[in-house]
Swiss-Prot record:
Keywords: Cytoplasm, Flavoprotein, FMN, Isomerase, Isoprene biosynthesis, Magnesium, Metal-binding, NADP
Reactions mediated catalytically: isopentenyl diphosphate = dimethylallyl diphosphate
Record-linked Pfam families: FMN_dh (PF01070)
NCBIfam families: IPP_isom_2
Gene Ontology terms describing biological process: isoprenoid biosynthetic process
Protein name from the UniProt record: Isopentenyl-diphosphate delta-isomerase
Family annotation (CDD domains): IDI-2_FMN
Subunit record text: Homooctamer. Dimer of tetramers.
Binding site for FMN: S71, S72, M73, T74, S102, N130, K197, T227, G277, L278, K279, A298, G299
Length: 345
């Protein structure tokens, strides 16, 4: 296992804090995703049967019944394990993709595997392993990353970029130097594609170009408008200075729509996941229209999964129905049609 000089109990406590704060506190960015400024032109005569609306797509070589990702959230604790289990069941039932929360803890506490091992209840979906990119500067090796992929039978590995969150954590990692060459090394080593994901502050055109240049296969832009992780860390702060530093960045980041436009300029055939402040299947449809291949949501799924299986199932179905109704009301039989639907910005 990893040589990371980390306090194992601190990792677990942080994960517990993150779940509790996200469920109980207002941690929304003061920025918006930008999608509220965009409207579809309503088609009053679509000439399409609702039952023929086709939301299917493919991702990582697997079929999706809808272009939706349950974005990475949690793992490592008993409560997180229960949440992941419910999320995986819901993803399998709906035929959508799922990302696991950061798996760094698994490298120092192998017994936490039970909180991430959901493949048995979700055998058919695209399942994404996950670790912070900065950990490549803190003793995590490509071999260990491959282990994380193998142990959960993942279809890809997410490297999340959470620089602002790390810098607003008292125990956060500060060394972000020379990461790109390490990402390239990892891309060339792994048996599965590498996905790079922001965590709520957006990817710029320049960063996207750099990542594509080293072989990253999928980009999750995760722009602002949803959870502000600096605000989460403000609630975790143990003194006034830490709280004030973290709170000052609540309006930081690139709105998701702006990030999507930037990244689409340089992405070519690289799939884009649009996440960050999306609240509905209508927002998801807007993301598809603006160039995303699939869209991700987290917060509403987390709250539903922590409550009950039935509420989570309803939440997933709500998103899908909103997407399908939007497609019909724009005259879009397929996702390709939706990508060309009339809009007003």
């Amino acid at each position: 296992m990893s040589k990371m000089p980390k306090n194992q109990n601190l990792d677990i406590e942080r994960k517990q804090d993150h779940i509790e704060i996200n469920l109980m506190k207002n941690v929304a960015s003061t920025l918006t995703s930008g999608f509220e400024s965009m409207q579809f032109i309503h088609n009053a005569l679509p000439e399409i049967n609702y039952d023929s609306i086709d939301t299917t797509s493919t991702f990582l070589g697997k079929s999706l019944q809808a272009p939706i990702l349950i974005s990475s959230m949690t793992g490592g604790t008993t409560r997180a394990g229960d949440i992941n289990y419910r999320l995986a069941q819901a993803a399998q039932k709906a035929g959508i993709a799922m990302g696991l929360g950061s798996m760094r803890v698994l490298l120092t506490k192998p017994d936490t595997i039970t909180t991430f091992a959901v493949r048995d209840v979700a055998p058919d979906i695209p399942l994404l392993a996950n670790i912070g990119a900065v950990q490549l500067n803190y003793f995590v090796t490509p071999k260990e990353c491959q282990y994380l992929v193998d142990v959960v039978k993942a279809d890809a590995l997410i490297l999340h970029l959470n620089v602002l969150q790390e810098l607003t954590q008292p125990e956060g990692n500060r060394n972000w130097e020379n990461l790109l060459p390490k990402i390239k090394e990892l891309v060339n080593y792994l048996s599965v594609p590498v996905i790079v994901k922001e965590v709520g502050y957006g990817l710029s055109k320049k960063v996207a170009e750099s990542l594509i240049g080293v072989g990253v296969k999928v980009l999750d832009i995760a722009g602002s408008g949803g959870t502000s992780w600096s605000q989460v860390e403000a609630y975790r702060a143990t003194n006034s200075l830490q709280n004030r530093i973290a709170s000052s960045f609540i309006n930081w980041g690139i709105p998701t729509l702006d990030s999507l436009k930037m990244v689409r300029e340089v992405s070519g055939d690289i799939p884009i996941i649009a996440s960050g402040g999306l609240k509905s299947g209508i927002d998801g449809a807007k993301a598809i229209r603006m160039g995303a291949n699939i869209f991700g949501l987290a917060g509403q799924f987390l709250k539903a999964a922590d409550t009950s299986e039935s509420l989570l199932s309803e939440e997933v179905q709500l998103i899908i129905e909103q997407l399908k109704i939007t497609m019909l009301c724009t005259g879009s039989r397929t996702l390709k049609d939706l990508a060309k639907a009339e809009i007003r910005l």
